[in-house]
């Protein structure tokens, strides 16, 4: 959790929440009997500005095969309103153990990174391996699918409560 405050009231305060920070904030909100929606709406009512909002779905079973999804994009087998994609595979030049020979993970972006909406799909298990040295087979989350919303899109996703619910229902097929 990062909180950056400026003495200049016009600049306000920046709150940036990542994984553990989100869990800490969630505990705080639960203790207050508030939801993320309540918190975000309160921030907007107080004049807050949302620069980016990431909505994540964890793939615990390894359903998403990111290299295969990348191949589908390469062969124009992906049906989407987005017009572009980027795929990255990371690794090490000097491999310290046998497991590293397969690379350090794949990431697929669907949509322009400059647009207000794009998807990011990545191998979370490899990320955990690199950050915390957790063996890949021991990670609970295999992949992560994120919808990244910026500026107005982030604002309207929160402002119109049902938009988030409808979005997730479409993704999970409910």
Regions found by a protein language model. Name each.
Residues 1-174:
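Structured, helix-rich domain cores that form ligand/interaction pockets
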């Amino acid at each position: 959790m990062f909180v950056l405050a400026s003495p200049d009231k016009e600049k306000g305060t920046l709150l940036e929440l990542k994984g553990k920070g989100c869990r800490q904030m969630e505990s705080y909100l639960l203790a207050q009997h508030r939801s993320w929606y309540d918190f975000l709406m309160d921030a907007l009512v107080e004049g807050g500005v949302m620069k980016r909002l990431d909505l994540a779905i964890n793939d615990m079973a390894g359903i998403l095969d990111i290299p295969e999804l990348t191949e589908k994009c390469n062969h124009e087998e992906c049906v989407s309103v987005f017009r572009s994609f980027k795929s990255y595979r990371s690794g090490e030049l000097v491999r310290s153990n046998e497991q590293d020979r397969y690379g350090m993970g794949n990431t697929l972006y669907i949509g322009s990174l400059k647009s207000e909406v794009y998807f990011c799909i990545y191998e979370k298990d490899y990320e955990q391996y690199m950050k915390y040295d957790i063996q890949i087979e021991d990670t609970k989350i295999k992949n992560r699918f994120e919808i990244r919303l910026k500026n107005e899109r982030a604002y309207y996703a929160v402002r119109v409560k049902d938009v988030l619910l409808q979005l997730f229902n479409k993704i999970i097929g409910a």
